[in-house]
């Protein structure tokens, strides 16, 4: 009978199997295309198992994975790690509680990242509890040092971040929690798209309701995610013109700009 692994870290085999499984799920969900995306798991105090560069996440095998140290230097494996590994390493460095990181380009969430719209509206109890708000990191060239620098401020307080004009990154206590947050992020973005841009109406949760959900989150041992602002009045948009972003933040920006111009006359 095999001995159960009592370490807080997965064995190499366990981690490799989990990464391959999550890679397939990301691919089948349409969160990645071609060779996009990357996944990593912390397998020791100074070791990370991660996905290789130039490989479709839907067709990975355990043998393709590569082990690196916290500086990104290869320890073992016949492949090269992704150039975006720096982003993963920064999350681990900023938040010691994190044990896994996922990065992908889920289409709806990425569209919000391109539009510059944070996922911060309290419309779904599950999103408040399991995911929290999702900020946007400033644009940085993929693979450059600017990417990890751009996400560093968000790694401790939040569970994920949108990358401007790029995609999304999520993290967690294991790779499945990190992946499920990626799923939640895309679902949350999709509902926001329907209510904000298509239906044009969303009844947001009140401050009191949000506080109750945050307390539930705390009891579940989740102390990260940020807190969305409550909006006690119904949010309704009458104009569904396709050439406008019907999202609160954009409308407020435009309104403020118009008022400034009016006052200056």
What are these model-predicted stretches?
Residues 1-265:
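Glycine-rich flexible loops
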